[in-house]
């Protein structure tokens, strides 16, 4: 990636855009369908970026769907001048776990109240999936140690007993990804080059959802 790269985290409830000169925009999911296209066009006019690094999925349906659609449309209008670099949070956090930066288990909330999951980075698999109301009452879940959650704008989606767990938020820049502990302000970093990402001309949302119907 060259220096004219913008960085987007579209996998949280309020999408964050960073640029090489520290310009950044936050767009809440409640306004994304109304504001995104105008913000994206204005950003391109001001910055004339060549590359887009996207921290993608798991995340909310609206953000993933609208952002990937608008990015693809923009690249079509620009006759494929843009290159996308796509990284999932599961791949990011797995790398962080392997470096001893993060605990083994991650409580994932993908912005549907029936889809709160526990991910095991040791075995790289989902252990369980519950609704929000079920999660409030699960004593066996409360006994889990070595767990973290991602800091988001709307923390009310997590049960109060999860306050004891580590909360991390993610920052991006030209060369590195930073993981910041909200309680201690300690931070760790991972070089983007470690992921050996290939340039893409289009980008797809991955909703981390299994089909609910079978077509015969």
Language-model-detected regions and their locations in the chain:
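Glycine/charged-rich beta-loop-alpha catalytic/anionic-binding loops adjacent to active sites
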Residues: 22-24, 51-55, 156-159
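Conserved short-loop catalytic and cofactor-binding motifs
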Residues: 24, 58, 196
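Catalytic-loop motifs flanking and including active-site residues across diverse enzymes
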Residues: 36, 66-70, 89
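N-terminal small/polar loop signature for handling phosphorylated ligands or for N-terminal nucleophile
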Residues: 38-42, 49
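DPxDG-like acidic metal-binding loop motif
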Residues: 51-56, 62-84
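Residue-level signal for short, function-critical loop segments
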Residues: 57-58, 211
């Amino acid at each position: 990636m060259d220096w004219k790269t913008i960085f987007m985290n579209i996998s949280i409830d309020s999408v964050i855009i960073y640029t090489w000169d520290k310009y950044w925009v936050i767009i809440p999911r409640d306004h994304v369908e109304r504001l995104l296209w105008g913000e994206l066009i204005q950003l391109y006019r001001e910055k004339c970026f060549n590359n887009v690094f996207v921290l993608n999925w798991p995340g909310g349906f609206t953000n993933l769907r609208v952002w990937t659609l608008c990015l693809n449309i923009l690249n079509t209008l620009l006759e494929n001048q843009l290159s996308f670099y796509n990284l999932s949070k599961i791949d990011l956090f797995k790398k962080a776990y392997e470096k001893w930066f993060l605990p083994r288990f991650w409580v994932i909330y993908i912005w549907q109240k029936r889809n709160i999951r526990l991910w095991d980075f040791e075995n790289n698999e989902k252990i369980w999936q519950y609704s929000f109301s079920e999660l409030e009452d699960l004593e066996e879940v409360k006994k889990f140690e070595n767990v973290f959650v991602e800091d988001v704008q709307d923390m009310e989606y997590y049960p109060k007993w999860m306050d004891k767990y580590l909360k991390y938020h993610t920052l991006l820049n030209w060369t590195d990804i930073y993981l910041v502990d909200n309680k201690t302000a300690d931070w760790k970093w991972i070089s983007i080059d470690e992921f050996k990402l290939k340039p893409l001309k289009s980008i797809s949302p991955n909703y981390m959802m299994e089909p609910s119907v079978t077509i015969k």
